[in-house]
UniProtKB/Swiss-Prot annotation:
Keywords: Neurotoxin, Secreted, Signal, Toxin. One of its GO terms (cellular component) is extracellular region. It comes from the Eukaryota. The lineage of its organism: Eukaryota, Metazoa, Ecdysozoa, Arthropoda, Chelicerata. It comes from Caerostris extrusa (Bark spider). Belongs to the neurotoxin 20 family. Expressed by the venom gland. Residues 1-21 form the signal peptide. Transmembrane segments: none annotated. One of its GO terms (molecular function) is toxin activity. This is U3-aranetoxin-Ce1a. InterPro entries: Atracotoxin (IPR020202).
Amino acid sequence: MKHLSIFFVFFCCICVMLCDAYGDCKKNSDCKAGECCVNTPPFARSTCQKYLQQGEFCAHMGKYNPLGKYINMCPCGKGLKCQLKDVSGPLALFRSRMLTCV
Protein backbone atom coordinates (compact mmCIF):
# COMPACT_ATOMS: atom_id res chain seq x y z
CA MET A 1 0.00 0.00 0.00
CA LYS A 2 2.89 2.34 0.79
CA HIS A 3 4.38 1.78 -2.68
CA LEU A 4 1.04 2.51 -4.30
CA SER A 5 0.76 5.80 -2.40
CA ILE A 6 4.28 6.83 -3.42
CA PHE A 7 3.54 5.95 -7.05
CA PHE A 8 0.29 7.96 -6.96
CA VAL A 9 2.05 11.05 -5.57
CA PHE A 10 4.83 10.72 -8.17
CA PHE A 11 2.26 10.32 -10.96
CA CYS A 12 0.35 13.42 -9.81
CA CYS A 13 3.58 15.46 -9.75
CA ILE A 14 4.40 14.40 -13.33
CA CYS A 15 0.88 15.34 -14.47
CA VAL A 16 1.14 18.79 -12.90
CA MET A 17 4.54 19.41 -14.53
CA LEU A 18 3.25 18.35 -17.97
CA CYS A 19 0.18 20.57 -17.67
CA ASP A 20 2.37 23.57 -16.88
CA ALA A 21 4.72 22.82 -19.77
CA TYR A 22 1.96 22.96 -22.36
CA GLY A 23 0.45 26.27 -21.24
CA ASP A 24 -3.19 25.57 -20.44
CA CYS A 25 -5.65 28.24 -21.55
CA LYS A 26 -9.29 29.18 -21.28
CA LYS A 27 -9.40 31.65 -24.18
CA ASN A 28 -7.13 32.99 -26.93
CA SER A 29 -6.05 35.98 -24.87
CA ASP A 30 -4.41 33.56 -22.38
CA CYS A 31 -1.88 32.62 -25.08
CA LYS A 32 1.24 34.41 -26.36
CA ALA A 33 1.35 36.34 -29.62
CA GLY A 34 1.26 33.92 -32.57
CA GLU A 35 -0.66 31.29 -30.58
CA CYS A 36 -4.30 30.35 -30.10
CA CYS A 37 -6.21 28.34 -27.51
CA VAL A 38 -7.01 24.85 -28.80
CA ASN A 39 -9.35 22.27 -27.29
CA THR A 40 -8.01 18.78 -28.03
CA PRO A 41 -10.55 15.98 -27.57
CA PRO A 42 -10.75 13.29 -26.23
CA PHE A 43 -8.92 14.79 -23.27
CA ALA A 44 -10.92 18.04 -23.47
CA ARG A 45 -7.81 19.89 -22.41
CA SER A 46 -7.09 23.31 -23.83
CA THR A 47 -3.52 24.32 -24.62
CA CYS A 48 -1.81 27.19 -26.41
CA GLN A 49 -0.52 26.18 -29.85
CA LYS A 50 1.10 28.10 -32.68
CA TYR A 51 -0.92 29.32 -35.65
CA LEU A 52 -0.20 27.20 -38.74
CA GLN A 53 2.44 28.42 -41.19
CA GLN A 54 2.54 28.40 -44.99
CA GLY A 55 2.61 24.87 -46.42
CA GLU A 56 1.43 23.18 -43.23
CA PHE A 57 -1.54 20.81 -43.25
CA CYS A 58 -4.74 22.55 -42.20
CA ALA A 59 -8.39 21.65 -41.80
CA HIS A 60 -11.60 23.58 -41.93
CA MET A 61 -12.41 22.09 -38.53
CA GLY A 62 -10.07 24.66 -36.99
CA LYS A 63 -13.06 26.81 -36.12
CA TYR A 64 -14.31 28.28 -32.88
CA ASN A 65 -16.45 26.15 -30.62
CA PRO A 66 -19.09 27.73 -28.36
CA LEU A 67 -16.49 28.23 -25.60
CA GLY A 68 -14.36 30.53 -27.79
CA LYS A 69 -11.54 28.06 -28.41
CA TYR A 70 -10.38 26.33 -31.56
CA ILE A 71 -10.99 22.61 -31.95
CA ASN A 72 -8.04 20.26 -32.66
CA MET A 73 -5.69 22.86 -34.20
CA CYS A 74 -5.14 26.55 -34.74
CA PRO A 75 -6.15 28.00 -38.09
CA CYS A 76 -3.64 29.29 -40.61
CA GLY A 77 -1.60 32.29 -39.51
CA LYS A 78 -2.24 35.90 -40.40
CA GLY A 79 -2.71 36.48 -44.14
CA LEU A 80 -2.93 32.75 -44.95
CA LYS A 81 -5.93 30.66 -46.00
CA CYS A 82 -6.66 26.95 -45.75
CA GLN A 83 -7.04 25.85 -49.37
CA LEU A 84 -7.16 22.67 -51.36
CA LYS A 85 -3.75 21.76 -52.74
CA ASP A 86 -3.70 21.32 -56.51
CA VAL A 87 -2.88 17.67 -57.14
CA SER A 88 -3.15 15.40 -60.14
CA GLY A 89 -2.67 11.74 -60.87
CA PRO A 90 -3.44 9.00 -58.35
CA LEU A 91 -3.24 11.44 -55.43
CA ALA A 92 -6.29 13.28 -56.78
CA LEU A 93 -8.41 10.60 -55.07
CA PHE A 94 -7.32 12.04 -51.72
CA ARG A 95 -7.93 15.71 -52.54
CA SER A 96 -10.14 16.22 -49.50
CA ARG A 97 -7.11 15.49 -47.32
CA MET A 98 -4.78 17.86 -49.19
CA LEU A 99 -5.58 21.14 -47.47
CA THR A 100 -2.62 23.43 -46.77
CA CYS A 101 -2.06 26.98 -45.60
CA VAL A 102 -1.34 29.27 -48.57
